[in-house]
């Protein structure tokens, strides 16, 4: 089990594309491994500019994008949508970059 000490933001509804689920299964990895990193502010393999943008997004409620490499080298993204007018994030999506 992977525990998150203090989430930086709410994920909303968690969804995934079939391709991302297949890639995770083939790599024998759980989506929770990456969701827990995402919600804790470990943005994975993003550039410094995207890392800084994500840090700001936690504060201002805009969209958050993380990228992670699976054991087999496949890259997955996790995108958490921007907050609505009530401060709620609707969903977080796990996907392959080519599914964007």
Please place each PLM-identified region on the residue numbering.
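Short, compact, well-ordered microdomains
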Residues: 59, 64-100
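Compact soluble domain cores
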Residues: 2-65
């Amino acid at each position: 089990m992977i525990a998150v000490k203090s989430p930086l933001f709410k994920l909303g509804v968690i969804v995934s594309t079939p391709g991302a689920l297949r890639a995770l299964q083939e790599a024998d990895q759980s989506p929770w491994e990456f969701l827990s990193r995402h919600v804790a502010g470990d943005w994975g393999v993003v550039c410094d500019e995207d890392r800084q943008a994500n840090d700001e997004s936690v504060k201002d409620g805009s969209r958050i994008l993380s990228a992670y490499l699976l054991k087999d080298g496949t890259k997955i993204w996790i995108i958490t949508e921007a907050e609505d007018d009530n401060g709620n994030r609707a969903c977080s999506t796990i996907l392959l970059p080519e599914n964007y």
